[in-house]
């Protein structure tokens, strides 16, 4: 039904991964593999929702409509079995801005924040930019898969006010198991360390694997976490700037909402809501995603086979989730 083979020219449209090639690397004829967005056409049902909104011809100030919350509530229930209330959902202009807000809201300058390298590099960037201290709990690469080092974590987490979890992991592709996540919850709760879980790649969990939302693994996890999600990676719409935060601890969520509201970060632009609602509501989004995941999985298999045939010394870290394939070139 959808043509994922179609090649669309993105140069000249302000696309980050193409337009930044020349100023960053001095040439623009490179294949950009440094930004995590797909080159698939934006799904037609999302484009149609945006066109309908444009037909009104007044792009004024916009409040979050009730269907925005309902669409998120129903989506995370259908996709991940996570029961949430609309009152536990908030808007975020992006995952990184959202996590940066959490850092500012729940920690103080000089506080320690733990991350698990190799991991999405903006985590370290926003910790430093907010004047906090990075504490590393490195993952262990074992038999082509990353695993957490819990013995090291128990020591590293001491004195940390926050742990930024990448679930599923970027770039390692791990879908963390419920058992692993429960251990994280136990260790962090025992040390008074808030877990901020970046779950933007959750919907891109590949066939044969199942994503587990951190907040669902235990009461400790539910009450000691803030979760960020978005349709941006799922449906290739990062330019919409439509992400969201879910927190089921009323006190934490009230503090966070007061913080972002006071900095005018709690509202989105006119297309952010309609884009998300169209992606998450109705069967079109589910069907598009199912077809996209099948296509992505075949691409990953192709990469692995070609590396084995052409460059056998380079090992692909085969992902459980996402379209990112981390290559071990050592």
What are these regions (language model features)?
Residues 277, 294-304, 315-329:
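Conserved glycine-rich beta-strand-loop-beta hairpin in the small C-terminal domain of fold type I
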Residues 59-186, 203-204, 211-216, 220, ...:
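Conserved core of the PLP fold type I
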Residues 217-255:
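Active-site PLP attachment segment
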Residues 2-94, 101, 279-282:
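N-terminal small-domain helix-loop-helix segment of the aminotransferase-like
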Residues 72, 240-248, 273-283:
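Helix-loop "lid/cap" segments that line or gate small-molecule binding pockets
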Residues 199:
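Walker B catalytic acidic pair
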Residues 34, 248, 324-330:
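Conserved PLP-binding active-site segment of the aspartate aminotransferase-like
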Residues 254-261, 280-304:
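Structural signature of PLP-dependent enzymes
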